[in-house]
Amino acid sequence: MKHQVAEILSKVIDQFKQEGVLDASFQPRVNVENTRDKSHGDFATNLAMMLTKVVGKPPREVAEMIVARLPESDVIEKVEIAGPGFINFFVLDVAKFDVLPSILEAGETFGECNVGQGRSVLVEYVSANPTGPLHVGHGRGAAYGASVASLLSKAGFRVSREYYVNDAGRQMDILAASTWLRYLQHCGEELTFPSNGYKGDYIFDIAQSLYEEKGDALRKPAENVFEGVADDEVTTADGETLGDKEKHIDDLIEKTKVLLGDEHYRVVFDKALDAILGDIREDLAEFGVEFENWFSERSLMDSGVIDAALEKLQAAGKIYEKKGALWFKSSEYGDEKDRVVVRENGLKTYFASDIAYHFNKLERGFDVLIDIWGSDHHGYVPRVKAAMQALDTNPEALEVLLVQFAVLYRGGEKLAMSTRSGQFVTLRELRDEVGADAARFFYVQRKSEQHMDFDLDLAKSKSNENPVYYIQYAHARICQVLSLAEERGYQLDTEMGLANLNRLTQEPEADLATLLAKYPEIIARAALAYEPHQIAYYLKELAHGLHAYYNSTQFIVEYEPLRNARLTLVVAVRQVLQNGLKLLSVAAPEKM
């Protein structure tokens, strides 16, 4: 309906050009928006105010000129000029139902559009270090990323979903060392576990599995392991901190590698990696989050991509040596300072891997790269964009979307979390408690960059205050009505229903039709803004309209034309509810 109003206004502009009011080359942008107040009509435009300087007349006078030239329309009931020159359009109630045939014909594809025009997009999200189970913070990134990818697919983009596996670097070495130390304890060795090691129960499980496979084959005396290792950090009774936990764990990593040797160290490393990554894959699949590609950081090293990217930067004069390290001139591209890419000891930094990874993404030919990161990585954005620019690529091709971590509340009390200490609520535990549907919806019902308090009690409640329950109940209510009609011997005749839409004269019916017509526009707008919360908000609004209609109207009436018209309307509502919920990977139950 909105595009029809825009087309009418475009015809007025053409007439202005023919009359010489506007220059033939002038191309004004025609803005048509939904009104917030029904007393102001259904749609409004500020076209008169946009043209006032060009036409040389006050905006209200320009508005009168526009209204006088509006062609006849079979959808517009009346037009009013308001305020300084807004033009409000009132749509005939019967015309509001014109969207219903499109919904019934398109079915699950209703709402899809082509604003993406087939452009290829790589959406990389979650990408949690495989050092432990996914926690509830990762869950928000997973739900948001999956919903953004689905939105883009519905909007005409060619979408690839990718998980970047950080299977190299210090954190993975800490994981391997932690696993081996727990394995030694299984072997009967007595030792003090490092304060900076991974302490979760999952480490015990992996170590036990390793022991069951290898027996004592990887056992070394604990005194050999800790010989020459820097003291761990401890706090004395009077509050003094002694030792160095970072040096302690780094020394233990080195001793682990030396004592095990390359082959056996790789056995421990791969055992921990495979166990945790396998759990992550399973966890995400159960959460309705799938990826086409799991991209290994280690593959960047093995294939020489990191060296190739750094060589390209070096050839462009963007890398220099200082104090034995190699630095990238990121400050030339807006970063606050230059960044190390190769340390004094010859080891490449995480940033070097990230440069190579984004270089690889561009080499694969994607038009748009979307990185979805935790908000704690906000300072990392300028340096990555700087690297892309230095590699002679368009930094605007990269969109970095930040996600605030979720904070859980149960019984009004905040739940504390720490991954390293093993004190956290896993995504699996959250799903077990509130269900995947509630988790997926709650995670995306606010802007990703907004702080999120996740109320576990609310997510489990069967009340109208729980938004996902409220929306699913609207869908179930429609299914219940249709089932009841069948039980009474009334078969739905949508052809008759569509032919009698003029019998739908109640305000809730027109309101529902207006909401249904908005869905394709919401999809396009939400996709371009990367904002799935717009879909969540829309579904709540549509569910509210359905519940209001249900509470005020009898659907199964004796008069067949009216009955079929009303049932056809709610079938259309059911379809759009299904489409929106499916986009967010939330079920649409038929019974509740």
From Swiss-Prot:
UniProt keyword Nucleotide-binding, yes or no:
yes
- Stored InterPro entries: aa-tRNA-synth_I_CS, Arg-tRNA-ligase, Arg-tRNA-synth_N, Arg-tRNA-synth_N_sf, ArgRS_core, DALR_anticod-bd, Rossmann-like_a/b/a_fold, tRNAsynth_Ia_anticodon-bd
Q: What class of enzyme is it?
A: ligase
> Which GO biological process categories is it annotated with?
arginyl-tRNA aminoacylation
One Gene Ontology term of the molecular function aspect: arginine-tRNA ligase activity
Spell out the reaction equation it catalyses. tRNA(Arg) + L-arginine + ATP = L-arginyl-tRNA(Arg) + AMP + diphosphate
Q: Which UniProt keywords apply?
A: Aminoacyl-tRNA synthetase, ATP-binding, Cytoplasm, Ligase, Nucleotide-binding, Protein biosynthesis
Compartments (UniProt record)? Cytoplasm
The organism's superkingdom is given as Bacteria
One cellular-component annotation, GO:
cytoplasm
Q: Where does this chain carry the motif 'HIGH' region?
A: 128-138
**What quaternary arrangement does the UniProt entry report?**
Monomer.
- What this protein is called in its record is Arginine--tRNA ligase
